[in-house]
Amino acid sequence: MTNIRKTHPLIKIINHSFIDLPTPSNISAWWNLGSLLGLCLAIQILTGLFLAMHYTSDTMTAFSSVTHICRDVNYGWLIRYMHANGASMFFICLFLHVGRGLYYGSYTYFETWNVGVILLFAVMATAFMGYVLPWGQMSFWGATVITNLLSAIPYIGTTLVEWIWGGFSVDKATLTRFFAFHFVLPFIIAALVMVHLLFLHETGSNNPSGLISDSDKIPFHPYYTIKDILGVLLLILALMTLVLFSPDLLGDPDNYTPANPLSTPPHIKPEWYFLFAYAILRSIPNKLGGVLALVFSILILMLFPLLHLSKQRSMMFRPLSQCMFWILVADLFTLTWIGGQPVEHPFIIIGQLASILYFTIILTILPAASLIENKLLKW
C-alpha cells in the first residue's frame, strides 16, 4: 500500500512543501527565518484573536478595554504583551530575512522576491493600524500624522485623507475601520505567504554559495525540521524573556496616556521598526518629496533584481560588495537612531546624509562594486 502522505490530495501538498521537499544541503541558519516568520504570524493571529474577543473599537472605551484585558482577563496581560512584542520579533525576523535575501542574491527569484516585498508592505500596514487601536496619545497622534501624509498627493489628497478618516479628523469612524482592517489583513498576509511559498517551490531554495545545488539536495524532514525547531525555541525564548521581564521596553510611555486631541506629545514617533523610514520621511523638507522618499525606501527593494550586475549570485565571494552591504546595514541603524531623535541640530543633517547614503549605496555604489569585481575576475 502506498504511503498516504504521498497519495492523499491534501496531505501530499504538505508533504511536497515540508517533508519530501528537496533542499540544498548547505543552507545556513539564515534560512531558518522563513519558518520563524510563519511562527510569528501564527502567534500574532492567535493572540490577536483572543484580544479581539475583549477589545472594543470605540473611542470612549478602546483605552479602558485594553486596560480591562490587562487587569481582569485571565492571562490577558500575557496575551496583550505577547501580541505587542510579537510584532517586534516579527519585524526583527523580517529585516533579517530581507537582509539574507540581499546578501545571498535570493532576489534573482523575482516572483518570490516581489511577493515578499508586497508582504513587507502588508505587514507594515497591519502593524501601523494595530498601533492605533489602544487609543493612547501616540496611537492617536501617530495615526493623525501618518494618514495626513496622504494629503500631499496632488489634487485628490485632502479628499482622500477625509475619506480614510471618515470625517474631518481621526475619530470613532477611523478607529472602527482600522480595527476591521487590522483584523482582516493578517489572513490576507497568510494567503500571500502561500503564494510566496508557491513561487519559491517552483525554483527551489537558494543557498549561501549562490551556486546551483540540484546535484546535492537532501529531504527537508528530518534535517531542516530539527534545525527549524531549534530556531523556534530560540525565538520563543527571546519573545518570552521580553514579555515577562520588560514588556514595555520597546513601547512608548506616551501610549499609557489616553488619546487627547487637544494635547500634542512633545515628540511624535512610530514604533522602533518604522523609525528608519520615518527618518527618511523627515529628512526631506518638502511634504510630497518626503512621502515619495518614504514609499521608495521600501519599494526600492523591487529594483534589486534589475540592479544585479555581478556575474556571481551571492556576496559570499565578493569582498567589495560585502563591505558596501555592511555599510548599508550600519546606515539603516543610523537612520533608526535618528528617527527616534527630536528634529534639531545635529540630528537633521545626520538624517539627511544617512538618507542620501541609503539611496546612493543601493542605486549606484553596489552595482558599481559588482562591475569592479567582475573586472577584477576578468569576467
Curated annotation (Swiss-Prot):
Role noted for this protein: Component of the ubiquinol-cytochrome c reductase complex (complex III or cytochrome b-c1 complex) that is part of the mitochondrial respiratory chain. The b-c1 complex mediates electron transfer from ubiquinol to cytochrome c. Contributes to the generation of a proton gradient across the mitochondrial membrane that is then used for ATP synthesis.
Family (UniProt): Belongs to the cytochrome b family.
Coiled-coil regions, chain positions: none
Pfam families for the chain: Cytochrom_B_C, Cytochrome_B
PANTHER family: CYTOCHROME B
Origin species: Poliocitellus franklinii
UniProt miscellaneous comment: Heme 1 (or BL or b562) is low-potential and absorbs at about 562 nm, and heme 2 (or BH or b566) is high-potential and absorbs at about 566 nm.
Complex and partners: The cytochrome bc1 complex contains 11 subunits: 3 respiratory subunits (MT-CYB, CYC1 and UQCRFS1), 2 core proteins (UQCRC1 and UQCRC2) and 6 low-molecular weight proteins (UQCRH/QCR6, UQCRB/QCR7, UQCRQ/QCR8, UQCR10/QCR9, UQCR11/QCR10 and a cleavage product of UQCRFS1). This cytochrome bc1 complex then forms a dimer.
CDD domains: cytochrome_b_C, Cytochrome_b_N
Bilayer disposition of the protein: Multi-pass membrane protein
Keywords, sorted A to Z: Electron transport, Heme, Iron, Membrane, Metal-binding, Mitochondrion, Mitochondrion inner membrane, Respiratory chain, Transmembrane, Transmembrane helix, Transport, Ubiquinone
Binding site for a ubiquinone: H201
Positions annotated to bind heme b b566: H97, H196
Cofactor section: heme b
Any one biological process term the GO annotation gives: mitochondrial electron transport, ubiquinol to cytochrome c
Protein known as: Cytochrome b
Binding site for heme b b562: H83, H182
Subcellular localization, as worded in the UniProt entry: Mitochondrion inner membrane
Cofactor: record remark: Binds 2 heme b groups non-covalently.
GO MF entries: metal ion binding; ubiquinol-cytochrome-c reductase activity
GO cellular component, one term: respiratory chain complex III
Transmembrane segments: 33-53, 77-98, 113-133, 178-198, 226-246, 288-308, 320-340, 347-367
